[in-house]
Amino acid sequence: MAAKEIIFHDGARAKLVEGVNLLANAVKVTLGPKGRNVVLERSFGSPVVTKDGVSVAKEIELADKVQNIGAQLVKEVASKTSDAAGDGTTTATVLAQAIVREGQKYVAAGLNPLDLKRGIDKAVAAAVDELKKISKPTTTSKEIAQVATISANGEESIGQRIAEAIDRVGKEGVITVEDGKSLADELDVVEGLQFDRGYLSPYFINHPERQLAVLDEPFILLHDKKISNIRDLLPVLEQVAKAGRPLLIVAEDVEGEALATLVVNNIRGILKTVAVKAPGFGDRRKALLEDIAILTGGQVITEETGLTLEKATLQELGRAKRIEVGKENTTLIDGAGDKPNIDARVKQIRAQIAEATSDYDREKLQERVAKLAGGVAVIKVGGATEVEVKEKKDRVDDALHATRAAVEEGIVPGGGVALIRVKQAIAALAGANADQKAGISIVLRALEEPLRQIVANAGEEASVVVATVAAGQGNYGYNAATGEYGDLVESGVLDPTKVTRTALQNAASIAGLLLTTDATVHEAPKDAPPTAPAGVPGAGAGGPGFDF
């Protein structure tokens, strides 16, 4: 096992704070509409230019082991905030730095770190309650566009695209972001349920100009096994032919004699059919087939439920208004499923999302919710160079998450004003003792910091602006984009409540841990012998902190 170095007390905290400051100083320059860019080196390819706080934080790894521990803890603030709210990473970093900086002064002056932390926690809980009081729900497409615009560093075109996407697919729909192939941003919307499986034979195509097989008012047969024997299918094919409707077959696979017979009947015009493979694999395939069944009002023909192909009836088949099958995708439009059943299925999947431990599982479950409840929109981000597209794509991602957060918990005035109003509301909060009162004052001072940083990045005098905003009421604040004071909600400067709340809670959590840290253990440098624990009286021949 490698030798370890141990540092105690003020020596440990001072190094940790240095690491916090190094990371936070690099991240906070990106805050606000006039935030600056940070250039990130890449081992391969061109450097990345970004204004995304979490992207900057993730790149930082410090040479000094103890400083790096401090930096990694603040990186955790940014990452956790990004995971929970999708935005607010820079605000969280600025708040964490402010709480640590102010708290370190009190700890150095001899105050009890645990009481300081209790005071910090008490102030944050009161601040969160106050945030919820001043929050108001997002009701219009315009407000959604404004939230997205602010999160995208003031780029209105991004805000409009996201608002348009949400209008098209609904608040439950999935919106994904991809690299575009042109200079302009584009929006593609898939309405209905789409899955990534295409026709099993090009002979099913009936729209050659679009290379699609299109079925109007079809029946849908869902089966979880391979179909190779046409005799298994004959009873259901005869019933569908009598009804005079086309048929979509979704099964694990359709092959051999069964596929050949379907193709021949299709070419001769006896029965219009299309066969596709079921999406997904294993348990996920079963779940997706069940989703399609609920959406189309049918049942999955499976031995597990006692149903067989030979005995299948039209009542067990799903229905849809229209189905389009391409080489790689199948889209079901306007399924005939009952709304209560679809809602119940969505609720069930939501419960699974809440319990999911992996990001991949969560993402796939979220996709299933969207396909059942809304649709899928793809924003294709355009730009002149790869670097520009990457930077813009990061901002679109942030804006997208911010709008989701706004829909979830509502909005507050942006530009750091909400935290100033919260500060005023909890200014009279009392602690159980003087040390807790000091902890509360740490948070009160930190609540000004996002506004101070936004103003500093805009090249103005922070103290003057903070005093002017504090003298106002409600939504009155400073719009750094225009350099003017006014009602920020009216001028479209909004923040999602969830983003501001999450940033404050995560910042206080990590800052509290740092302030109550009294020792660090880290690997000793390979080219130096282990040293005595710093800050321990009488350690080694020369006293605290000396080599021995």
Swiss-Prot record:
UniProt enzyme class: isomerase
Keywords: ATP-binding, Chaperone, Cytoplasm, Isomerase, Nucleotide-binding
Bias-annotated ranges (Gly residues): 537-548
GO cellular component: cytoplasm
GO molecular function, one term: ATP binding
InterPro entries: Chaperonin_Cpn60_CS, Cpn60/GroEL, Cpn60/GroEL/TCP-1, GroEL-like_apical_dom_sf, GROEL-like_equatorial_sf, TCP-1-like_intermed_sf
Biological role: Together with its co-chaperonin GroES, plays an essential role in assisting protein folding. The GroEL-GroES system forms a nano-cage that allows encapsulation of the non-native substrate proteins and provides a physical environment optimized to promote and accelerate protein folding.
The protein's name in its UniProt record: Chaperonin GroEL 2
Organism: Burkholderia pseudomallei (strain 668)
Gene: groEL2
